[in-house]
């Protein structure tokens, strides 16, 4: 958490294996290797310059063999491009709860998987319309039309 909050990509590199597989709902496919994870961190911090992680109270942590589950929350204000896919900054603040699953090898994270509600984040940022809104109903109409034309 400190590596993220300090924007310290070198500290992150020390926590993960060279062949890390990093899966996050914000990524279209897992990041593989230290440089890819560092770039994901940089891109996340460009999109959310005040991005911060915290622990719930009480902390949520479970360890079984080489697997660690860790609960957290993340918050930040969308002030830079969100890549991928390239959403323009909305200036809106988001906060979401989530947890990580780490598979450890030789004291470092070899496989990382984050779990959080990306749709909730998109709604908070105004990228996806609120449930029941006119915009959502319009998207439903467009999706149905696309499905009908695509058959």
Mark where each language-model region is.
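C-terminal and inter-domain tail/linker signature
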Residues: 1-151
């Amino acid at each position: 958490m400190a590596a993220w909050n300090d924007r310290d990509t070198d500290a992150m590199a020390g926590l993960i294996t060279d062949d890390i597989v990093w899966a996050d709902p914000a990524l279209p496919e897992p990041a593989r290797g230290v440089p890819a994870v560092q770039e994901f961190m940089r891109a996340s911090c460009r999109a959310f310059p005040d991005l911060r992680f915290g622990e719930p109270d009480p902390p949520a942590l479970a360890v079984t063999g080489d697997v660690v589950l860790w609960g957290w929350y993340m918050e930040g204000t969308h002030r830079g491009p969100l890549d991928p896919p390239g959403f323009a900054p909305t200036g809106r603040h988001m906060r979401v709860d989530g947890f990580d699953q780490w598979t450890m090898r030789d004291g470092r994270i070899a496989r990382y998987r984050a779990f959080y509600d990306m749709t909730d984040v998109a709604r908070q940022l105004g990228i996806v319309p609120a449930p029941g809104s006119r915009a959502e109903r319009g998207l439903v109409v467009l999706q149905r039309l696309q499905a009908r034309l695509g058959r």
